[in-house]
Amino acid sequence: MQKGNIGVTTENIFPIIKKFLYSDHEIFLRELVSNAVDATQKLNTLASIGEFKGELGDLTIHVELGKDTITISDRGIGLTAEEIEKYINQIAFSGANDFLEKYKDDANAIIGHFGLGFYSAFMVAKKVEIITKSYRDEAQAIKWTCDGSPEFTIEEVDKADRGSDIILYIDDDCKEFLEEARVSELLKKYCSFLPVPIAFGKKKEWKDGKQIETTEDNIINDTTPLWTRKPSELSDEDYKSFYTKLYPMSDEPLFWIHLNVDYPFHLTGILYFPKVKSNIELNKNKIQLYCNQVYVTDSVEGIVPDFLTLLHGVIDSPDIPLNVSRSYLQSDSNVKKISTYITKKVSDRLQSIFKNDRKQFEEKWNDLKIFINYGMLTQEDFYEKAQKFALFTDTDNKHYTFEEYQTLIKDNQTDKDGNLIYLYANNKDEQFSYIEAATNKGYNVLLMDGQLDVAMVSMLEQKFEKSRFTRVDSDVIDNLIIKEDKKNETLEGEKQEAITTAFKSQLPKMDKVEFNVMTQALGDNSAPVMITQSEYMRRMKEMANIQAGMSFYGEMPDMFNLVLNSDHKLIKQVLDEEEAACHPEVAPIQTEMNSVSKRRNELKDSQKDKKEEDIPTAEKDELNELDKKWDELKNKKEGIFAGYASNNKVIRQLIDLALLQNNMLKGEALNNFVKRSIELI
């Protein structure tokens, strides 16, 4: 028996492994099974070139549970005593301290970086044995034993067959890895597509009402997964079946892209376009990254462009440096090339479907839209390609490319300054009356109700020359696309004040909502009262909900305009009745206000060119008294209008109709509206 110390050029390796990899204990199984696969494939290679002339036989790798042990057995090339010394005892770990300091926050980077895959066994084992026999003729079987200290023993043993058995004596605090269900879960996660058969236990079958173990090996992996095969060999059903295998609970994918490139890097895989139903963030990280069919991670940021992390599927590449920090990944030239390649393949595939089967593309647009919009918002080179097949959808559910839509609306929706106005709605039902008003004028209205459409509107305004997007409820229809300068026909000062004050006094109090009441001549066929909201302020508040750094707008109240149509007979009727009812009280107040106003103006004119200190104190005092008097009279007059309005059911009814039309009438206010409507009927 030989004894010795493991050669580590700095500090003991085992505390390092325990300290930095405690959160990733489970990857020991991935590493050990991967090593067994490598040993098996190397034997296959030697046989193919004539260096191994023996019988290959069954090359299945076995994972077996004992009372306190896990054993991974292969019939690969095995190890000689010299190879044990070279690859196990003398660990090339120069610069370990520097490495650990650099990657102390990226624990998974350590495993595999310096050939430490085998030593991951010590994360879960208090003792490890290797019983191995080389494929070479006359090789002596060797048993290597280590208890987690730098000391080891090597002794000759009897072993009939070539290959290696790695026996782990599991630590007391890692007993979960002796549970069949837990090991099965890890093998399924990491080893489902390894290229050599992996057996874990025996298959079971139902017999006499219970499960009975058979003599047949339970093979847990598919050695030739779909992405390793030629696309020409595969049917649509093959792709769909593989998708169901990867994502059992998901709907059928929209379509897929088979990746296969050998130069200047190696990359295979299949990417699926799923149906994204809800929150974007919840749908990320569904792409599985493999290295030579060994599962590595589903966090593919930095390898796949951000917008494509919404896709599902598999990417397999030996050229992605898996065991380094994410910051290094992002600067690696191969990773950048792979990212660019994937983006190009996706855009080419979308362009191909659009060109060859536009009907299918339009049918799937609602599901594709989030991928394409996300890509255009976040990646300029994708935008350049996608602008040729990205679609607008109007409220009649017709689809147009950007160029087609521009041609459609340019004659009728260009304003007096030459700006092309894109009208849109984000809720077809709630904004129906505004959409109808626009379409009655011959305008086309887009439906932009997607998760990313707020951001898309802002981006497209910057991309499109002399263009502006305006929501149909942001103003009255005649102001959405102003085609010529025109005089704003509205009520005279006193009449406007009377009716706007009356309506304003009856507006309900709403949390963080403010109204500005105005009058406008909209024609006798338009609604008597409308609610609009400034495009700019609404858009800023919407952006504040999805973009950091704009919380100021999010805290501001919602500002709405209550527009009274002075041409409508009901508004005229309210105004006439208000004037008749209020005139006796208001007239003397207005006369007094006119007198106060005249004197205020005289004083202000006389003080116009004087310095503050040159104005007599008496004049200052008089002006202050006049201001107070003015406010007092104004409040008194407004009180009269408000008093009249409080007893006028038509005013309250018109306000509630406008609120109801905008989905702003709820609770007690809605109940009162219903009661009042019944009374009026």
Swiss-Prot record:
One of its GO terms (cellular component) is cytosol. Residues 599-620 have a biased composition (Basic and acidic residues). The keyword Ribonucleoprotein does not apply. Residues 327-545 are annotated as: B. Pfam families: HATPase_c_3, HSP90. Keywords: ATP-binding, Chaperone, Cytoplasm, Nucleotide-binding, Stress response. Residues 589-620 are annotated as: Disordered. It comes from the Bacteria. GO terms for biological process: DNA damage response; protein folding; response to heat. HAMAP family: HSP90. Homodimer. This is Chaperone protein HtpG. The lineage of its organism: Bacteria, Pseudomonadati, Bacteroidota, Bacteroidia, Bacteroidales. The gene is htpG.
